[in-house]
Amino acid sequence: MGIQGGSVLFGLLLALAVFCHSGHSLQCYNCPNPTTNCKTAINCSSGFDTCLIARAGLQVYNQCWKFANCNFNDISTLLKESELQYFCCKEDLCNEQLENGGTSLSEKTVLLLVTPLLAAAWCLHP
């Protein structure tokens, strides 16, 4: 196979890698009825690209969600809760509740929060 044939093969493989996916869907804990210890994991349906954990007082909701709808208005409307805290994440089973009642933050999320602060501190340092 010459250089041209190798380039065509490489292009074809690259196109397949970009346009085909393995079929892996996001896994989230899913307990749409409030519970304090959700352990039911499901594969999210197509179009649901985010895991959600929402807390309204003692009520805790875990489910698959759409990232585009990860905002207070959409979540509070669907759950019919006027005051709540929520967290959306995009890794498998990332919407698990911690023992102390908090939500687990992934290492990447923490890094995304801390990095700009460190950069700002570095720039402001005389």
Curated annotation (Swiss-Prot):
GO cellular component, one term: side of membrane
Keyword Lipid metabolism: no
Keywords: Cell membrane, Disulfide bond, Glycoprotein, GPI-anchor, Lipoprotein, Membrane, Secreted, Signal
Disulfide bonds: 28-51, 31-38, 44-64, 70-88, 89-94
InterPro entries hit by this protein: CD59, CD59_antigen_CS, LY6_UPA_recep-like, Snake_toxin-like_sf
Entry's localization field: Cell membrane; Secreted
Binding partners and assembly: Interacts with T-cell surface antigen CD2.
PROSITE patterns for this protein: LY6_UPAR
Residue ranges listed under propeptide: 101-126
Organism listed in the record: Papio sp.
GO molecular function annotations of the record: complement binding
Glycosylation sites: 43
GO BP: negative regulation of activation of membrane attack complex
Post-translational modification (record): N- and O-glycosylated.
CDD domains in the record: TFP_LU_ECD_CD59
Membrane topology recorded in Swiss-Prot or TrEMBL: Lipid-anchor; GPI-anchor
Function field: Potent inhibitor of the complement membrane attack complex (MAC) action, which protects self-cells from damage during complement activation. Acts by binding to the beta-haipins of C8 (C8A and C8B) components of the assembling MAC, forming an intermolecular beta-sheet that prevents incorporation of the multiple copies of C9 required for complete formation of the osmolytic pore.
GPI-anchor amidated asparagine lipid modification positions: 100
Signal peptide: 1-25
Protein name: CD59 glycoprotein
Segments forming domain UPAR/Ly6: 26-106
Lineage: Eukaryota, Metazoa, Chordata, Craniata, Vertebrata
